[in-house]
């Protein structure tokens, strides 16, 4: 799952850069949204992993 969120961030960065270079504000905005979505997924995944680790420690 982490790979998917990183890929989404990279894809967003490429779109944002391409939109900036081509002066395409829609593509640039779409890239920013993809980056933000990927980052949010990454943060959520990290939090979920920490909660699961904590639960595993409680079980021991």
From Swiss-Prot:
Listed name of the protein? UPF0337 protein SSP1897
User: What organism does the record attribute this protein to?
Assistant: Staphylococcus saprophyticus subsp. saprophyticus (strain ATCC 15305 / DSM 20229 / NCIMB 8711 / NCTC 7292 / S-41)
Which stretches does the entry tag as region Disordered?
Answer: 1-60
> Which family does this protein fall into?
Belongs to the UPF0337 (CsbD) family.
Question: Basic and acidic residues: which segments have biased composition?
Answer: 23-60
InterPro entries per the UniProt record, alphabetical? CsbD, YjbJ_sf
SUPFAM superfamilies this protein is in?
Hypothetical protein YjbJ
């Amino acid at each position: 799952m982490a790979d998917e969120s990183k890929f989404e961030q990279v894809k967003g960065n490429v779109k944002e850069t391409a939109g900036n270079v081509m002066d395409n504000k829609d593509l640039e905005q779409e890239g920013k949204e993809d980056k933000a979505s990927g980052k949010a997924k990454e943060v959520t995944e990290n939090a979920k992993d920490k909660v699961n680790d904590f639960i595993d420690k409680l079980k021991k």
